[in-house]
A protein has these predicted regions:
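A structural boundary/capping signal
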Residues: 1-142
Protein backbone atom coordinates (compact mmCIF):
# COMPACT_ATOMS: atom_id res chain seq x y z
CA UNK A 1 0.00 0.00 0.00
CA UNK A 2 1.42 3.34 -1.03
CA UNK A 3 0.47 6.39 0.99
CA UNK A 4 1.20 10.05 0.48
CA UNK A 5 3.72 10.42 3.31
CA UNK A 6 5.71 7.43 2.10
CA UNK A 7 5.62 8.77 -1.46
CA UNK A 8 6.75 12.33 -0.67
CA UNK A 9 10.47 11.61 0.02
CA UNK A 10 10.62 9.07 -2.81
CA UNK A 11 9.38 11.65 -5.31
CA UNK A 12 11.66 14.33 -3.94
CA UNK A 13 14.66 12.01 -4.23
CA UNK A 14 13.74 11.02 -7.79
CA UNK A 15 13.38 14.53 -9.20
CA UNK A 16 16.26 15.96 -11.16
CA UNK A 17 17.14 18.31 -13.94
CA UNK A 18 16.57 15.36 -16.30
CA UNK A 19 12.93 14.97 -15.15
CA UNK A 20 12.11 18.69 -15.32
CA UNK A 21 9.68 20.07 -17.92
CA UNK A 22 11.87 21.74 -20.59
CA UNK A 23 9.82 24.94 -20.21
CA UNK A 24 11.02 25.21 -16.59
CA UNK A 25 14.66 24.18 -17.05
CA UNK A 26 15.98 27.76 -16.81
CA UNK A 27 14.43 28.02 -13.31
CA UNK A 28 15.27 24.51 -12.05
CA UNK A 29 17.95 24.23 -9.34
CA UNK A 30 18.92 21.53 -6.84
CA UNK A 31 17.65 23.93 -4.15
CA UNK A 32 14.21 23.92 -5.84
CA UNK A 33 13.95 20.34 -7.17
CA UNK A 34 10.14 20.52 -7.46
CA UNK A 35 10.39 23.16 -10.20
CA UNK A 36 8.96 21.82 -13.44
CA UNK A 37 8.03 18.43 -11.99
CA UNK A 38 4.26 18.89 -11.60
CA UNK A 39 2.95 17.19 -14.74
CA UNK A 40 5.06 14.04 -14.59
CA UNK A 41 4.65 13.80 -10.82
CA UNK A 42 0.86 14.17 -10.93
CA UNK A 43 0.62 11.40 -13.54
CA UNK A 44 2.67 9.02 -11.41
CA UNK A 45 0.71 9.86 -8.26
CA UNK A 46 -2.55 9.24 -10.13
CA UNK A 47 -1.24 5.88 -11.33
CA UNK A 48 -0.26 4.84 -7.80
CA UNK A 49 -3.08 6.35 -5.72
CA UNK A 50 -5.94 6.85 -8.19
CA UNK A 51 -8.16 9.90 -8.25
CA UNK A 52 -8.08 12.79 -10.70
CA UNK A 53 -5.53 15.03 -12.38
CA UNK A 54 -6.23 18.70 -11.72
CA UNK A 55 -4.91 21.54 -13.91
CA UNK A 56 -4.67 25.19 -12.87
CA UNK A 57 -3.05 28.30 -14.28
CA UNK A 58 0.05 29.98 -12.88
CA UNK A 59 -0.29 33.76 -12.80
CA UNK A 60 2.23 36.54 -12.18
CA UNK A 61 0.80 40.01 -11.85
CA UNK A 62 -2.52 38.76 -13.16
CA UNK A 63 -1.06 37.35 -16.39
CA UNK A 64 -0.78 33.65 -17.15
CA UNK A 65 2.81 32.41 -17.27
CA UNK A 66 2.15 28.68 -17.19
CA UNK A 67 0.11 25.76 -15.98
CA UNK A 68 0.25 23.57 -12.89
CA UNK A 69 -0.91 19.99 -12.25
CA UNK A 70 -1.78 18.35 -8.95
CA UNK A 71 -3.95 15.46 -7.74
CA UNK A 72 -7.38 15.00 -6.22
CA UNK A 73 -7.38 11.70 -4.35
CA UNK A 74 -10.35 9.29 -4.45
CA UNK A 75 -11.67 10.67 -1.14
CA UNK A 76 -11.77 14.19 -2.60
CA UNK A 77 -8.64 15.57 -0.89
CA UNK A 78 -6.27 17.61 -3.06
CA UNK A 79 -2.58 16.82 -2.78
CA UNK A 80 0.18 18.78 -4.48
CA UNK A 81 3.66 17.31 -4.12
CA UNK A 82 5.21 20.17 -6.11
CA UNK A 83 3.45 23.19 -4.57
CA UNK A 84 6.68 24.46 -3.00
CA UNK A 85 8.22 25.14 -6.43
CA UNK A 86 6.56 28.53 -6.79
CA UNK A 87 8.06 31.93 -6.11
CA UNK A 88 6.06 34.35 -3.93
CA UNK A 89 4.86 36.29 -7.00
CA UNK A 90 3.49 33.15 -8.69
CA UNK A 91 -0.14 32.32 -7.90
CA UNK A 92 -1.95 29.13 -8.94
CA UNK A 93 -5.61 29.64 -9.80
CA UNK A 94 -8.47 27.54 -11.07
CA UNK A 95 -8.42 23.81 -11.10
CA UNK A 96 -10.20 21.68 -13.68
CA UNK A 97 -10.21 17.90 -13.88
CA UNK A 98 -8.19 16.59 -16.81
CA UNK A 99 -8.36 13.26 -18.61
CA UNK A 100 -5.50 10.90 -17.81
CA UNK A 101 -3.60 10.19 -21.03
CA UNK A 102 -3.83 6.52 -21.94
CA UNK A 103 -0.36 5.01 -22.15
CA UNK A 104 1.34 8.04 -20.62
CA UNK A 105 1.89 11.58 -21.81
CA UNK A 106 2.97 12.66 -25.27
CA UNK A 107 4.62 15.82 -23.94
CA UNK A 108 7.52 15.29 -21.50
CA UNK A 109 7.34 11.54 -22.15
CA UNK A 110 11.07 10.96 -21.57
CA UNK A 111 10.93 12.86 -18.27
CA UNK A 112 7.85 10.87 -17.20
CA UNK A 113 9.45 7.51 -18.09
CA UNK A 114 12.63 8.39 -16.20
CA UNK A 115 10.80 9.64 -13.10
CA UNK A 116 8.34 6.74 -13.16
CA UNK A 117 11.21 4.23 -13.33
CA UNK A 118 12.99 5.84 -10.38
CA UNK A 119 9.84 5.99 -8.26
CA UNK A 120 8.76 2.40 -8.99
CA UNK A 121 12.29 1.14 -8.28
CA UNK A 122 12.40 3.03 -4.96
CA UNK A 123 8.98 1.67 -3.97
CA UNK A 124 10.08 -1.86 -4.86
CA UNK A 125 13.31 -1.45 -2.86
CA UNK A 126 11.33 -0.13 0.10
CA UNK A 127 8.93 -3.09 -0.06
CA UNK A 128 11.83 -5.54 -0.24
CA UNK A 129 13.50 -3.89 2.77
CA UNK A 130 10.24 -4.08 4.71
CA UNK A 131 9.86 -7.79 3.84
CA UNK A 132 13.39 -8.53 5.05
CA UNK A 133 12.74 -6.58 8.26
CA UNK A 134 9.58 -8.66 8.76
CA UNK A 135 11.64 -11.85 8.50
CA UNK A 136 10.81 -12.85 4.95
CA UNK A 137 13.58 -14.16 2.74
CA UNK A 138 13.60 -12.26 -0.56
CA UNK A 139 13.80 -14.05 -3.92
CA UNK A 140 13.70 -17.59 -2.54
CA UNK A 141 11.23 -20.30 -3.40
CA UNK A 142 9.23 -21.51 -0.44
Amino acid sequence: MTDTEMLRPILRGAWGRDTCDPHDLPDWTPENPARGQCGVTALIVQELLGGDLVLGEVLVGGGRVGYHYWNRLPGGRDIDFTADQFRPDEVVTGGTIQAVPVGGPRRCREQWELLRGRVLTALDDQERSRSVADGETPNRAR
